[in-house]
């Protein structure tokens, strides 16, 4: 993983202006194709050839408190804009958006540049999708390039990463705030299994959500859980549940696995990949770049939320930073009509992290960290 901590320290002195490897089969894969049809945009550059895959059997168990109806075939009312396919000079973009100018940080073969504003510092490396925002790892859609001694960045990254982070002030609801917490898995869907004693992920995610709920309520949030017991619920129904309750934010809680590899560790936070951008992780599913889902209307807000939560958990736990990531296969995020993220709070396949996750005090620490990230 890209860890340019020393680069960040160098950058701050400039005074600039203004999951992992594949888990056990089916660990977090969608239970079935989403109950809607994604809207195809008009521009279709040829993406990489995606591997063939087979979806697991469909599971569709209704929540006991609400009757679910399928989403309409088309959920995006207006046609989204065509994906950006151009590259732009980062210096010209900085002038146009009144940020600090990009500055080179190193003369080594790994050439990195920093660009900052009053909101923070973004560091990119030429030829790499790895980047950092205020010291927290992230992943670009496309690797920046050097052309005639200038840094060029893909237009999708400028629109979906640079602008939301460097130029836009994060906004969260201040009144009548509703947040839906989604404890991953449940019922016959255990999730991943602890390498220590075989305890299922579903038990730990539910406990995490139960600990988090009163902390958010104390801050004025109305908190609704997609499940409050060991109940099975299809990922598409979790999205429908959130929409039915008019959620302002949606946070799905999970733990990770790289079994049989026991070495992988750390924290990842996901939001859905913007239309027209390749994902950070696909887990073998086709990465259909040019499909548009309801939650893509909140790309900027989801990214900002992901960084708030991710940074807060890192600071509280000292976990390895695996970064804020983008994925398109996460069905629980696709149908959301509000900013939405999925947190992978550690690896149950790693003995050391599994030991922490099984400790109630550590799960309380995770809950406190998520609550601290929200106003």
Question: What are the functions of these language-model segments?
Answer:
Residues 1-8:
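Bacterial N-terminal signal peptides that target proteins for export
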Residues 22-200, 207, 212-215, 219:
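Primary recognition of N-terminal secretory signal peptides and signal-anchoring hydrophobic helices
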